[in-house]
Amino acid sequence: MALSCGIRTLKNVAVPLKRYPTIAACGLDCGLCPRYYTVGKSRCPGCCGPDFAEKHPTCSFITCCVKRKGLEACGECPEFPCAKFKSTEEYRAAEVSAYPPARKMLPNLHFIKKYGIARFVQQQRQRIRLLESMLGGFDDGRSRSFYCRAAALLGLRGVEGALRKAKR
């Protein structure tokens, strides 16, 4: 049985607590992470995706943001940035992390706060589409992290242009 981080019932229909597992409550860009595209046991299903609770049994961001407040990401919360972000060394380290999804945690949340989750997800889906095109057409089996990094950190126009040139 797949364990997610929670289900709510609406009109007798089970509905996941999160609609978008590709953006984590904490701002991690799950949909652009190499582990999201890994085949096998180490694959991460994204925030609150199937089997998420087995891989990540406790997450204070999910408890506060998703379960208590019913939000997709902390950037939707009127209290963001709360003391949790201001006092978390993890976020200071994330800004200089070599792990691409971590470098975008706070910028993602600030974008969501300013423009909303729908606009963020729209742009993220463009990045995911480009990443999946790179992985499907050019991955030699060892380039997944490189392509994830490009999709996460480079501008959309730059990635689209490079992909067009590569396809010629």
Predicted feature residues:
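Short loop/turn segments that flank or connect secondary-structure elements
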Residues: L3-I7, G75-K167
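N-terminal cysteine/histidine-rich coordination modules
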Residues: C5-I62, K67-C74
